[in-house]
């Protein structure tokens, strides 16, 4: 798959996961890796950017048998941004799907 396709939606995927529940970085990386072919280390720059943009906040949580983990949570702005970006992405994806279908139908008629 073209890396540019993935790059454009990874932030939305991170926001989507964090809308469901707070997660620590490795957990986010593992979840995305199960569904999308991403390189190691892809998620942490995204998390830093989203936090710098005010979309995420972090907190430390003690874990039994190990050091505390840094958890990520959506801020109010993060939830609002997710809703807006999700709607825009779905509209865009629908438009692309329509264009591809029209092209396919035109080619079938030839």
List PLM regions with ranges:
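Short beta-strand "wing" residues that participate in macromolecule-binding interfaces
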Residues: 58
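Glycine-centered, phosphate/nucleic-acid-interacting loop/turn motifs that mediate DNA/RNA or nucleotide
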Residues: 54
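Alpha-helical DNA-recognition elements
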Residues: 45, 49
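Amphipathic alpha-helical dimerization/coiled-coil segments
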Residues: 80-110
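Basic, amphipathic "hinge/linker" alpha-helix immediately C-terminal to the N-terminal HTH DNA-binding motif
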Residues: 63-86
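N-terminal helix-turn-helix DNA-binding core of bacterial DNA-binding proteins
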Residues: 2-44, 61
């Amino acid at each position: 798959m073209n890396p540019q396709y993935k790059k454009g939606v990874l932030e939305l995927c991170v926001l989507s996961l964090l809308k469901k529940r707070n997660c620590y970085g490795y957990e986010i990386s593992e979840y995305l890796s199960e569904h999308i072919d991403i390189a190691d280390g892809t998620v942490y720059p995204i998390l830093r950017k989203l936090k710098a943009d005010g979309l995420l906040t972090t907190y430390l949580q003690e874990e039994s048998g190990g050091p505390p983990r840094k958890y990520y949570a959506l801020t109010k702005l993060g939830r609002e941004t997710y809703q807006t970006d999700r709607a825009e992405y779905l509209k865009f994806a629908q438009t692309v799907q329509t264009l591809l279908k029209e092209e396919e139908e035109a080619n079938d008629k030839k």
